[in-house]
Amino acid sequence: MDRIKLNDTLEMSRLVYGMWRIGDDTDTSIAHIQNKVSACLDQGITTMDQADIYGGYAAEEILGNALTPELRNQIEIVTKCDIVAPMGRYADVSVKYYDTSRAHIFASVEHSLRLMKIDHIDLLLIHRPDPLMDHNETGAALDEVVASGKARAVGVSNFRPYDWDLLQSGMKTKLVTNQIEMSLMCHTPFTNGDLAHLQRLGVPPMAWSPLGGGALFHSSNTGLREKLTKIGAAQGVDEAAVAVAWLLAHPASILPVLGTNNLDRIKQIGDAAKVEMDRQTWFALYTEALGHEVA
């Protein structure tokens, strides 16, 4: 499995295991979570993607309960903060909102460290752009989180280029990634400047929902599904692996985040790295996704 360098102290596996729905599994036992992580490690997938809000603010603890020192030393943990929703530890709030204040960032970091039973976060992301963000306050807080050793690196999620530039202007530490939605179902970042912005900066993006939340395989686009099936059959992999390989083929060094609770599916995540994707194949899939040929 290829690895991507985000800064001088942090590398992550090219494919990332997403734990968004880990709390939705009928089995959240320590043994089952450990089996999921081990299935990832067997393929060279060492990076686990979390967020404080996942599972109604319970997913981090589910992972933490399963982390032995040996497992912790083999993985990188990504987590996110700034979404406050009326559930879990925020059940008393009256409205869902974003909070990028220093106080909230530090409280969130402490919660994450305690729930996951770890002494540092490998990568902390601001989960969503906050309309009330004071970029100097937020930037200084992120700088402090890194300087204190509580996070090895910081980044953002769902930021547009202007959101990124604003926050970065208030920081000394370099942001190392932007986790955005990208897939054959959501391909606008390839043309709206989001990827171009990150490429210009030399920043590897992360891609959430790289299979369109499963909609890719249930859409009315039969042409796209047939192309994925044909390419997969020729290379001995399933359609999902081909769809993820489409992202891997882009020169921006995209890190797809794949989430599933099915252990057999987890064991196949690494297949995407085996797929060969030339330019014509890439554009054949893109054409089907667009619904028309390129101009």
Predicted regions and their residues:
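Active-site groove signature of glycoside hydrolases
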Residues: 113-132
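Beta/alpha (TIM)-barrel catalytic core signal, keyed to glycine-rich beta->alpha loops juxtaposed to Asp/Glu
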Residues: 3, 129-295
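N-terminal binding-site loop/beta-alpha segment at the start of enzyme catalytic domains
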Residues: 1-75, 294
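Short, acidic/polar
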Residues: 27-40, 100-116, 162-165
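N-terminal small/glycine-rich loop or linker at the start of catalytic domains
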Residues: 7-25, 78-96, 125
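Alpha-helix N-cap and loop-to-helix initiation/capping positions
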Residues: 28-35, 58, 93-104, 130-137, ...
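Acidic (Asp/Glu)-rich catalytic clusters
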Residues: 7-8, 65-76, 113-117, 146, ...
